[in-house]
């Protein structure tokens, strides 16, 4: 590819990654099985990331791309391509593969930041979170005995399902962990699959609630992106086992797994559309933006939090700063 210019070379490698994700969708779903996470999944994605790290590093050394963390960019691109290759089952006009690749190149080079000046408050720091909105009574702690029992079962399910996987976990282990009788379990759930489906929806609610508590404190969509991503990684660090359950459940009940992401995407799209109208975000297709940003955030969370077997797992300040730089400004070198 040495005879091509940098944009053409970037097109070649992104088209290769997007096509690979699209043509190997079933294999990517198989990698969601929790039993395979340490043994196969890490090595598989690392082998892909190694190629893209090398490409990004080489282009940065030539002055063709900005020298951001190549590992972050590599996993971010994997996430962007993977989420845009999924069949989300939504109606309406769909973009062609070539159109999606063109948009990924545009996003990679130019970022999402719009033309409106971003006025950051005094004392603003890229790694800081505002105080979250307090929970109201409706969204706070469970108040009835039945609600408390159901939440205890969900809390136990997070631990047991996360440790053993959906297939190997059994109801007896979950009820013992929750401190309830098996008969009580069947008052609330028809089966283990019914529990897992309920747990996926419960987790989705918790995450959306957490993000809203922080994002509602912001006035600018770019600030909302920054705060939302920080809040997501904070949530993920507290609930690492969740991301071993949701992908695995896609193998059993794809509709619920897809619902999990579509529910998150629906609210996200509204905020990005408003940001576009205020010129805080560039005029890129909202559906593409949602899938790209969700994919990038998802895979970086996997790489730095879920796939790290230490209590200190997390996205470092420097990596997060480079994520924001990549999302907002892209990799195209700035003119002096």
Give the ranges of each region predicted by the language model.
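Alpha-helical DNA-contacting segments of helix-turn-helix folds
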Residues: 31, 189, 196-203, 246
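Helix-turn-helix
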Residues: 152, 159-194, 198
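Amphipathic alpha-helical packing segments from all-alpha helical-bundle domains
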Residues: 12, 19-20, 37-62, 71-75, ...
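Amphipathic alpha-helical segments used for helix-helix packing
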Residues: 8-9, 15-39, 53-54, 86, ...
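Hydrophobic alpha-helical connector segments
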Residues: 1-23, 77, 198, 212-238, ...
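C-terminal peripheral helix-coil segments that are non-catalytic and often amphipathic
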Residues: 19, 50-61, 80, 90-155, ...
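Generic hydrophobic, amphipathic alpha-helix propensity
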Residues: 1, 52, 149-157, 174, ...
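DNA-binding recognition helix and immediately preceding turn/loop
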Residues: 4-8, 140-141, 162-176, 219-223, ...
């Amino acid at each position: 590819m040495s005879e091509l210019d940098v944009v053409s070379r970037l097109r070649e490698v992104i088209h290769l990654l997007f096509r690979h994700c699209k043509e190997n969708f079933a294999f990517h779903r198989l990698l969601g099985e929790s039993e395979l996470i340490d043994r196969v999944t890490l090595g598989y994605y690392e082998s892909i990331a190694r190629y893209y790290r090398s490409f990004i590093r080489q282009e940065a050394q030539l002055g063709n791309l900005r020298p951001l963390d190549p590992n972050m960019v590599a996993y971010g691109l994997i996430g962007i391509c993977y989420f845009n290759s999924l069949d989300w089952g939504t109606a309406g006009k769909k973009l062609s593969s070539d159109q999606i690749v063109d948009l990924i190149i545009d996003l990679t080079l130019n970022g999402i930041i719009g033309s409106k000046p971003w006025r950051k408050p005094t004392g603003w720091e890229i790694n800081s979170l505002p105080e979250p909105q307090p929970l109201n009574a409706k969204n706070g702690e469970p108040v009835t005995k039945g609600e408390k029992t159901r939440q205890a079962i969900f809390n136990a399910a997070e631990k047991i399902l996360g440790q053993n996987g959906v297939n190997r976990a059994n109801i007896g282990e979950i009820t013992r962990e929750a401190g309830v009788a098996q008969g009580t379990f069947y008052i609330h759930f028809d089966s283990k699959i019914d529990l897992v489906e309920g747990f996926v929806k419960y987790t989705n609610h918790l995450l959306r609630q957490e993000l809203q508590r922080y994002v509602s404190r912001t006035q600018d969509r770019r600030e909302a992106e920054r705060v939302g991503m920080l809040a997501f990684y904070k949530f993920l660090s507290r609930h690492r086992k969740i991301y071993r359950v949701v992908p695995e459940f896609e193998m059993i009940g794809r509709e619920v797994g897809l619902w999990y992401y579509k529910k998150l995407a629906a609210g996200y799209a509204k905020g990005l559309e408003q940001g576009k109208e205020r010129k805080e975000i560039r005029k890129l297709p909202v559906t593409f933006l949602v899938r790209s940003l969700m994919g990038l955030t998802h895979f970086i969370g996997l790489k730095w939090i879920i796939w790290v077997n230490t209590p200190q797992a997390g996205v470092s300040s420097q990596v997060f700063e480079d994520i924001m730089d990549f999302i907002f400004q892209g990799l195209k070198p700035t003119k002096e």
